[in-house]
UniProtKB/Swiss-Prot annotation:
Its EC number is 5.6.1.7. It catalyses: ATP + H2O + a folded polypeptide = ADP + phosphate + an unfolded polypeptide. This is Chaperonin GroEL. One of its GO terms (biological process) is protein refolding. Disulfide bonds: none annotated. Residues 539-548 have a biased composition (Gly residues). Gene3D superfamilies: GroEL, GroEL-like equatorial domain, TCP-1-like chaperonin intermediate domain.
């Protein structure tokens, strides 16, 4: 086992504080409408430029191991805030820095660290309740645009694009961000259910000019099995041919004579048919086939349910207004499934999302939810260079997370004003002893830090502006972009309540642990013995000098 380096008390805390400040100072320059960029060196390719707090935090590793421990703990604050709300990482880092700095001063002055932490926790619990009282719902397109604009660093086009996307696919719809090919941002909306499986044979194509298969008012056969024997399919093919409607077959696989028969029938015009593989794998495939059958009003032909393909009838098939199949995707538009059945399926998926523990499972469940409830919107980010593209894409993703958080828990006045108002309303709070009271004051003072930093980044005097804002009431605050005072809601400067709440809670949680730290342990650096071993043979040969 490697030897350890152990530091105690003030010596440990000073080292840790140095690490906290290095990371927080690098992150906080990005805050506000006049925040600066940070350039991050990469091991290969061009450096990346960002105004995203968590991207800056993730890049920082310090040489001194004790300082690095402090930096890594604050990095955890930014990561947690990012995971919870997708934004507010810079605010969370700044709050943590302020609480740690003020808290460690109090510890050095002889206060009890545990009581300080209890005071900080008490102040935060009270502040979160006050935040909920200040929060107003964010439901209209204008408010969503404003939240998106603020989070995208005052880029109004991004805010408007996100609001348009949410309007088209609904608040539950999936909105993805991709790198575009042009200079302008674009919005592409896919209505209906789309999955990543294309036609099994190019001979199904009936629109050669675009290379796609288009079926109008088709029957849809959903089978959770491989189909290779054509005899299984003959009864259903005959029934569909008599109806005069086209047929889409979605199955685990379709091969051999079964596929050949379908191709021949399609080319001769006996029955207009197309076949695709079922999306997903394993249990996820079964769930998605069930989704498709519910959306189209059909049944999944599955041997597990004792259903045989040979005995299936037109009543077992689903229907849709239109199906479009390309080389890579299948889109089902206007499924005729019953609304209450679709709605109960949506409720079931929502319940699964709440119970899911892994991010991957949640992401896949959200995709299924969107496909059933509205559609998918793709935001394509345009830029002149790759460096700008990466920076812009990160901002758009932040803005998207912020707008989702705003719809979920509402909004409060932005620009650090909400936290100042909350601190004012919590100022009469008292703990069980003086040390707890100091902890409460530490937390309340920290709540002014975001406003002070926004003002500092815009080149004004933080204390003057903070006092002016404190003298005001309600949503009265300072607009750093235009250098004027007024109602932040009227200015369109809003923060999602969830983002502000998460930032405060995670900052206080980690900062409280750091204040109560008394000992730090790390590995001692290993001594490089190679230089000693290289020098020993030469030293042993010294006596040979007399032979010359």
């Amino acid at each position: 086992m490697a030897a350890k380096d152990v530091k105690f008390g003030n010596e440990a805390r000073i080292k840790m504080l140095r690490g906290v400040n290095v990371l927080a100072d690098a992150v906080k320059v990005t805050l506000g409408p006049k925040g600066r960029n940070v350039v991050l060196d990469k091991s290969f390719g061009a450096p990346s430029i960002t105004k995203d707090g968590v991207s800056v935090a993730r890049e920082i590793e310090l040489e001194d191991k004790f300082e690095n421990m402090g930096a890594q703990m604050v990095k955890e604050v930014a990561s947690k805030a990012n995971d919870a709300a997708g934004d507010g990482t810079t605010t969370a880092t700044l709050l943590a820095q302020s609480i740690v700095n003020e808290g460690l001063k109090a510890v050095a002055a002889g206060m009890n660290p545990m009581d300080l932490k209890r005071g900080i926790d008490k102040a935060v619990i009270s502040a979160v309740e006050e935040l909920k009282n200040l929060s107003v719902p964010c439901s209209d397109s204008k408010a969503i645009t404003q939240v998106g604009t603020i989070s995208a660093n005052a880029d109004e086009k991004v805010g408007a694009l996100i609001a348009e996307a949410m309007e088209k696919v609904g608040n539950d719809g999936v909105i993805t961000v991709e790198e575009g090919t042009g200079l302008q941002n674009e919005l592409e909306v896919v209505k209906g259910m789309q999955f990543d499986r294309g036609y099994l044979s190019p001979y199904f194509i009936n629109k050669p000019e675009t290379g796609i298969v288009e079926l109008e008012n088709p029957y849809i056969l959903v089978a959770d099995k491989k189909i290779s024997n054509v005899r299984e399919m003959l009864p259903i093919l005959e029934s569909v041919a008599k109806s005069g409607k086209p047929l889409l077959i979605i199955s685990e696989d379709l091969e051999g004579e079964a596929l050949a028969t379908l191709v021949v029938n399609s080319m001769r015009g006996i029955v207009k048919v197309a076949a695709v593989k079922a999306p997903g794998f394993g249990d996820r495939r079964k769930a998605m086939l069930q989704d498709i059958s519910i959306l189209t009003g059909g049944s999944v032909i599955s041997e597990e349910l004792a259903m045989e393909l040979e005995k299936s009838t037109l009543e077992d098939l689903g229907q849709a207004k239109r199906v479009v199949i390309s080389k890579d995707t299948t889109t089902i538009i206007g499924g005729v499934g019953e609304k209450h059945t679709i709605q109960s399926r949506i409720s079931q998926i929502r319940q699964e999302i709440q119970e899911a523990t892994s991010d991957y499972d949640k992401e896949k469940l959200n995709e299924r939810l969107a496909k059933l409830s509205g559609g998918v919107a793709v935001l394509k980010v345009g830029a002149a260079t790759e460096v700008e593209m990466k920076e812009k894409k990160a901002r758009v993703e932040d803005a998207l997370h912020a707008t989702r958080a705003a719809v979920e828990e509402g909004v409060v006045a932005g620009g650090g004003v909400a936290l100042v108002r909350v601190a004012g309303k919590t100022s009469n709070l008292r703990g069980q002893n003086e040390d707890q009271n100091v902890g409460i004051r530490v937390a309340l003072r920290a709540m002014e830090a975001p406003l002070r930093q926004i003002v500092s980044n815009s080149g004004e005097e933080p204390s003057v502006v903070t006092n002016n804002v404190k003298d005001g009431k309600g949503n009265y605050g300072y607009n750093a972009a235009t250098d004027e005072y007024g109602d932040m809601i009227d200015f369109g400067i809003l923060d999602p309540t969830k983002v502000t709440r998460s930032a405060l809670q995670y900052a206080a949680s980690v900062a409280g642990l750091m204040i109560t730290t008394e000992c730090m342990v790390t590995d001692l650096p290993k001594e490089d013995k190679s230089s000693d071993s290289n020098s020993s043979p030469a030293g042993g040969m010294g006596g040979m000098g007399g032979m010359m």
